[in-house]
Amino acid sequence: MTIDTYPPNSPATAGPISATRVHLPGSPAFDAGTRLWNGAVTRRPAAVVRPTSRTEVQSALRYAADTGIPVAVRGGGHDWAGRALATGGLVIDLSLMRRVEVDVASQTALVSGGSTAADVVAATEPFGLVPATGTYGGVGRSA
């Protein structure tokens, strides 16, 4: 469901974004969107947006720019320094954007920001292609 009007302090005020994509502390989606590989990182954002399209990413970025709040982008949440979180800011969690398009002729792939190494391997394997990647499939990938 997409809603066209939002509270004034919502990431959705910047444009059309589903209210179901904006998550606040205490919700399971907020917890999932702030979970990191490095458990020592203690940054606590104000909200998480889990977009499924470029338009929703743009809306979240416009909101952050208009309000001056910090933004962090979370792919797989595997960064050792915890840069996927911004204290008091907005996390754009790309985990729902996991598309991988393989161009066999050029042996390249277009990889969405929420894709993992396992997603890339699974997409290239049917074509006999092997991407340069580590051994843990849960690590985020984008290129």
Question: What is each model feature region?
Answer:
Residues M1-A143:
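N-terminal accessory segments
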